[in-house]
Amino acid sequence: NALLPNWLWLPVGYHGRSSSIITSEVPVVRPKGQTKVEGENPKFEASARIDFELEMGFYTFDGKPLGERISTAEAEDFIFGLSLFNDWSARDIQQWEYVPLGPFLAKNFASSISPWIITLDALQPFAVDTPVQEPAVLPYLKFEGKKSYDINLEVFIQPKDGAEDRVCLSNFKYMYWNMAQQLAHHTVNGCNIRCGDLMGSGTISGPTPDSYGSMLELAWKGTKPLTLSDGSQRRFIQDYDTVIMKGHCTNGNIRIGFGEVRSQLLPAQD
């Protein structure tokens, strides 16, 4: 679908929850919820469209008191570091429930993070320019300097007892809105942040089809299935598939790895 009118004007987001954030190697159970096919009544059933979303998560220090905002110029002073982040989604549940208040059961069943947090200080050699933003952003979202980061990202799908197949090769530098802008927008109304708060970047998709950061895009909403090395096809993630995300930065003789976040999808419970 075309971007909504607000997408080029503000970093669209929503508040989540911490209770179902899990680390690498913790399996994810296929969720159930309401789905609806056009012309039919809603059904309560297991989601048939489980998707990964390739993201980075950034972690904050304690922020300012409630009622005070953080500017883009000072935002990185409040960011401790980053990890890999798989923001699981149930697309069919999401499609029915998200209007008008946004996703709920489609997102809160699990979010997976890698075990390593790389500090923002360590990432400074990999700072790059943010993509050109048109139209010009509002004053509180303007910034100076290099606020994006060159982080190479990969996603693999591994069927049960099968090989890992890379399905996505992307980069954090493709993000339209940088972290400083995201944090400035998050706090512009006076919302406070606390030490250890986790902010998801949003899906990281690049300019080419192999850099799209979700199955929704890679398989084009199921109309262009991916073929794995064993000959099987994927429109979305199947039971017992393992989704693996990896990330690293490299610059001459310097290489910093983010490790990986590895999560297997298990069948829905009765």
Report the location of each language-model feature.
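Acidic, glycine-rich active-site loops and adjacent beta-strand->loop/helix elements
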Residues: 27, 88, 205, 249-250
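Exposed beta-sheet edge/beta-hairpin loop segments within beta-rich domains
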Residues: 45-49, 190-191, 234
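Active-site microenvironments in enzyme catalytic cores
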Residues: 1-169, 177-181
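Hydrophobic alpha-helical scaffolding
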Residues: 103, 172, 230-233
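Acidic, low-complexity intrinsically disordered regions
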Residues: 170-171, 265
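Active-site pocket scaffolds in enzymes
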Residues: 177-185, 192-195, 199-248, 254-266
